[in-house]
């Protein structure tokens, strides 16, 4: 807590990228709902794969650096932070879990929410489940199947809805581009890129069991289910080299 009484969180540098350090999920929620007022800005989950994308693509780096709240979603990133900053009290906050926690808090407080992305049927199921489970005040939605020409009208819909949380499930970097552009018209909300979270929430895609997650082996579980991911996993060897050579 800072001198004003607002919940604070330390910042850490990893390969030049500034990450926010949350101790756990309650800390993350209290930080985002500071003094009962939701912070404005963009939430971006950082894992090893995204760290590589930041290194290799200047446009992605600019997008990610511009986001106000970059947090450690991947266990590899958490371990790197703890190695570089031995006193850091930082834990993994999985993006899918943070989204659910935000939705639950939004339902309890009546915070207006706008959902973007996903297949039409998945989005409809997501809305229905959010309303049934937590009475979330969903003030608008749009599936991921819209044309570039429809973007501006969608930005205006989001602004006119008065949403205070906007979650975007379009995959990276498309969702980061969308959030950046929408915020230029309507900055008065918390934006969150959520990738495939709607699919997980509705049961169309299954996450690794908690046992695998706790061991930091969620990536291996996904590899067993999808052997075609092997090329993506080989790319992550470069991140391991940074970690073990101290080039963080």
UniProtKB/Swiss-Prot annotation:
**Pfam family example for this protein?**
Glyco_tran_WecG
User: Which InterPro entries does this entry report, sorted A to Z?
Assistant: UDP-ManNAcA_Trfase_WecG, WecG_TagA_CpsF
What species does this protein belong to?
A: Klebsiella pneumoniae subsp. pneumoniae (strain ATCC 700721 / MGH 78578)
What EC identifiers does the entry list? Answer: 2.4.1.180
Q: Which GO terms describe its molecular function?
A: lipopolysaccharide N-acetylmannosaminouronosyltransferase activity
Gene Ontology BP annotations: enterobacterial common antigen biosynthetic process
Name the pathway it acts in. Answer: Bacterial outer membrane biogenesis; enterobacterial common antigen biosynthesis
Q: Which domain of life is it from?
A: Bacteria
Q: What is this protein called?
A: UDP-N-acetyl-D-mannosaminuronic acid transferase
CDD domains (alphabetical) = Glyco_transf_WecG_TagA (cd06533)
Q: State the reactions this protein catalyses.
A: UDP-N-acetyl-alpha-D-mannosaminouronate + N-acetyl-alpha-D-glucosaminyl-di-trans,octa-cis-undecaprenyl diphosphate = beta-D-ManNAcA-(1->4)-alpha-D-GlcNAc-di-trans,octa-cis-undecaprenyl diphosphate + UDP + H(+)
């Amino acid at each position: 807590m800072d001198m004003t009484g607002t919940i604070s969180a330390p910042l850490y540098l990893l390969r030049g990228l500034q990450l926010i350090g949350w101790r756990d999920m309650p800390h993350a929620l209290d930080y985002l709902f500071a003094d009962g007022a939701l912070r404005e800005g963009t939430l971006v989950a950082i894992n090893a794969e995204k760290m590589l994308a930041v290194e290799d693509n200047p446009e992605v780096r600019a997008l990610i650096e511009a986001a106000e709240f970059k947090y450690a979603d991947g266990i590899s990133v958490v371990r790197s932070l703890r190695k570089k900053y031995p006193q850091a009290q930082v834990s993994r906050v999985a993006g899918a879990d943070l989204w659910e926690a935000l939705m639950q808090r939004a339902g309890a407080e009546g915070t207006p929410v706008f959902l973007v992305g996903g297949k039409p049927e998945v989005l409809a199921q997501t809305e229905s489940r959010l309303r049934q489970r937590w009475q979330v005040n969903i003030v608008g939605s749009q599936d991921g199947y819209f044309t570039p020409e429809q973007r501006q009208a969608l930005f205006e819909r989001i602004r006119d809805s008065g949403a205070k949380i906007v979650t975007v499930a379009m995959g990276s970097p498309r969702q980061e581009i969308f959030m950046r552009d929408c915020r230029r018209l309507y900055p008065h909300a918390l934006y969150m890129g959520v990738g495939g979270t709607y699919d997980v929430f509705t049961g169309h895609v299954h996450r690794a069991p908690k046992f695998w997650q706790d061991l930091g082996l969620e990536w291996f579980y996904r590899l067993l289910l999808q052997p075609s991911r092997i090329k993506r996993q080989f790319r992550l060897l470069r991140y391991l080299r940074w970690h073990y050579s101290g080039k963080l």
